[in-house]
Regions:
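Glycine-rich phosphate/pyrophosphate-binding loop regions near the starts of catalytic domains
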Residues: 23-155
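N-terminal amphipathic/basic leader segments beginning at the initiator methionine
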Residues: 1-34
């Protein structure tokens, strides 16, 4: 039976990345967030919306395109996350929606915990500025599909 390790996925590096990002994520919260890091889904107490006349939920997904290549070439990963949040939040506010929460998806060729933590720190910083909770995410290691230093982010 093949294992993650046999396929080139480093679970230990992923676990280290989670430990490194916990402090950043804690800063990107709202009182309505239920639960913590590591669950299969982020939970948000929607009863906070009951005071609204006609509460509607809006959602948006976006990425940062080729800016990931600029971040990679510069070796600077903490600003790309903030840019990601700006793209998602902008798409929501133009509809008149309040961005309540978001999740992230980070795909990498090889997990470098410090790089992942820097990306998430930027996402958390952007979320804090927008009063938006970061309630979940996924870091996916794709050896063979992406080069070791390649990555993409979406939220």
């Amino acid at each position: 039976m093949a294992t993650y390790k046999d396929s080139g996925v480093d679970i230990d590096a992923g676990d280290r990345a989670v430990e490194l990002m916990k402090a950043s994520i804690a800063k990107a919260s709202r009182p309505e967030v239920m639960g913590g890091i590591g669950g299969f889904a982020g939970l948000f107490d929607a009863s906070a919306l009951k005071s609204m006349k006609q509460p509607l939920l809006a959602t948006s997904t976006d990425g940062v395109g080729t800016k990931t290549e600029i971040a990679r070439q510069m070796g600077k990963y903490d600003t790309i996350g903030e840019d990601l949040v700006a793209m998602v939040v902008d798409d929501l506010v133009v509809c008149g929606a309040e961005p309540l929460f978001m999740t992230d998806y980070i795909a990498v060729g090889k997990v470098v915990p410090e790089h992942i933590a820097d990306i998430v720190a930027g996402i958390a910083r952007g979320c804090s500025k927008a009063n938006t909770a970061l309630i979940g995410g996924e870091t996916a290691e794709h050896p063979g599909l992406l080069d070791d230093d390649e990555f993409d982010v979406a939220g």
